[in-house]
Design a protein with these regions (language model features):
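Short acidic/His/Gly/Ser-rich catalytic and metal-binding motifs that mark active-site loops
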Residues: 14-19, 128-136
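Short, glycine-/small-residue-rich phosphate/pyrophosphate-handling segment
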Residues: 77-131, 147-150
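N-terminal beta1-alpha1-beta2 submodule of the flavodoxin-like/Rossmannoid cofactor-binding fold
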Residues: 1-78, 140-142, 146-196
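Short alpha-helix boundary/capping motifs
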Residues: 116, 134-139, 187
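Compositionally biased, intrinsically disordered low-complexity regions
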Residues: 4, 91, 129-134, 141
Length: 196
């Protein structure tokens, strides 16, 4: 369908902790985030995937979201936040409860940064509670799970549909949501209430 996919395993990358675009400017010796950030900003679709740990998304996923947030000062050509006009989703997997809670947190975080979240923008697979095989381990049943396969398919198509809609229409309309205009003193049809 003409979609190129890049996979970035954050756990395998040297991503510094912090909320600045480049943490080497703030005391860290190494930080691969600036290069990763370029890939993220070049993408129309971002899917964050996380295991469940103690009912929450992983600390690595939290770090990625914090680093995305570190770029929230960036603006697009229309003066909106840089993540406007892009779509986001998430995938959660693990052997304990909390998939919907994790998805709720990840999707909220993405929309707060400016991503558009389509309907059914999450998918999850949960193995048997307790220590056990992971999704791709032999005998896990993960790849054969109809519920997970259906939700992953719907997630994928909804991301593609909304990304295409945004691309074809030039993104989110640039009126009433331009940080550059607000900073310049425009109040974008938001009249100060007259208290009487």
């Amino acid at each position: 369908h003409g979609v190129a996919v890049d996979t970035i395993r954050a756990i395998d990358r040297d991503i510094a902790t912090g909320v600045w675009p480049d943490m080497t400017e703030h005391g860290w010796e190494r930080d691969e985030w600036p290069a990763i950030s370029e890939q993220v900003l070049a993408a129309d679709i971002l899917v964050l995937a996380t295991p469940i740990w103690l009912g929450e998304k992983s600390s690595v996923c939290t770090k990625v979201i914090e680093r995305l947030y570190g770029n929230s000062h960036l603006l697009n050509e229309a003066g909106q936040y840089a993540y406007y006009g892009r779509v986001g989703g998430c995938i959660v997997t693990g052997n304990e409860d909390g998939a919907k809670h994790c998805a709720m947190n990840v999707l909220y975080s993405l929309q707060h940064l400016g991503y558009t979240i389509p309907p059914q923008a999450d998918s999850a697979w949960l193995g048997e509670a307790g220590p056990g095989p992971s999704y791709l381990d032999e005998g896990s049943g993960g790849p054969e799970n109809d519920f997970t396969n259906r939700n992953t398919t719907f997630l994928t198509w909804n991301l593609l549909h909304v990304a295409r809609m945004l691309k074809d229409t030039g993104g989110i309309p640039a009126h009433g949501n331009q940080r550059s205009e607000w900073d310049a003193g425009c109040r974008l049809d938001f009249a100060n209430p007259d208290y009487r």
